[in-house]
Amino acid sequence: MNVQAITSKVVSTLGNKESLIPIILKDGVDSTSLTVKSYKEGGIVEGKDRAIDEFGTQAIWVGGIPFFKKLIDYTAYKKAKLNPGVDIRIIADKEYSKWAKDNAQGIMSNSKTQTVKQAITDCLVDGGKKAKNLYKGKVIAATALTLATYFLLTKGKQKNTKDSVIKNMNEEIKKPTFKGNHSTPAIFKDFENTEKNTTPKKPSFKGLAKSVSEAILFNPVHNMQIIDAGITSERLACSRNKTELAEHAIKEGSFLFFLYGFGGLIEKGINKLADKKFNKPIDLSIDVLMDDTFAKALDKGTVIKDVDKASGCKTPTDKLNFIKNNPDNIFVQAAKKSKIVSTVKHKGKDVVDTSKFIDMKDFDALGENLKNLSNKLAQSKETTKKFLNKTKGLKVASVMANIGISCLFLGYLIPKAVYKYRKMKTGTTKFHVEQDIRNGKK
């Protein structure tokens, strides 16, 4: 794999709004920096407490949903004889599902023998009711089980921290000292009573089904937002004192804002700057910008013509037929490069995978972006190669800037804000929960 291919892969992944990789990267920076800061400012006990919470949460957060979904795929779906690889959005749309079934070709990507046509046909039995209900149950169950797993982690972490503090206190008492008059630590005076206050209220998952919308069901990033909201709620509910509650509010609120909101604002701002100041639109996927076929089409001036060929499509079905029947059209090729259209092998050729949903809003937006880039090239006095090289450079810079700015806030400013608040509130950056345990408050 050459440098261009590696660059394309990295930038494409980090700049993909549907990908979990950039979210995992930002969360990793956040978790690592907070853990290091906890060891430095709060001490060993808090460092361990934070490490279990942050990295344990990340493992559950990233692995929980996929694990439980796979478990349901291998159990409930297998029993129902339905292929989980068929996009449920297709089954939910009668017109789309008919087109998908009638135009299906090739073998399902998650099967060695089952055809795309058979997989779709199976899911359409009983009008797709069985498939839709099974899918909804799968997402709800996977989400609830993931949140329940985090709840168990939280209880285990808090017990581990308390046990560690008590162990340290016992060792301190056993150490010989020249000072007499040892007083019994408060925690041992009324140990049973403190236990009553350490058990957080068990979170309720009632009504979860009602709160899950289609956007959450069908989008892995939105699904993660529900997980984050649940984890944030549990962290706040299980806070061991008011200071920890406020710290969680600062940390979690900032994390969710930068993770899901600020990244999009940065991207829009950089894209607008590139278009206005440098006359280089960078809305297109890096995979499209680095494609030689696309570069040749730009050079020949055929991009706008190819996009306009789809303008005669009156209905979504017309557009679907256009995509299927025009594999050499640069607009269609760009849609495949942008992951808007999925493909599957059939008789040695890449054909449209009709089991995967094609979002027409994304397809139409791609057409506008292709025309915009082509028009900007025509207005410039640069060669196609020079124009594209500058555009690709700006695209790479925009993605890296987005990730970099978010990591700066999550990895430096937010941890600093948390401990600044703690010092302002308690007069020290030391672990207040440890002190509460020593004083018998927890």
Language model segments and positions:
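Glycine-rich, hydrophobic membrane-spanning regions of integral membrane proteins that mediate transport
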Residues: 1-442
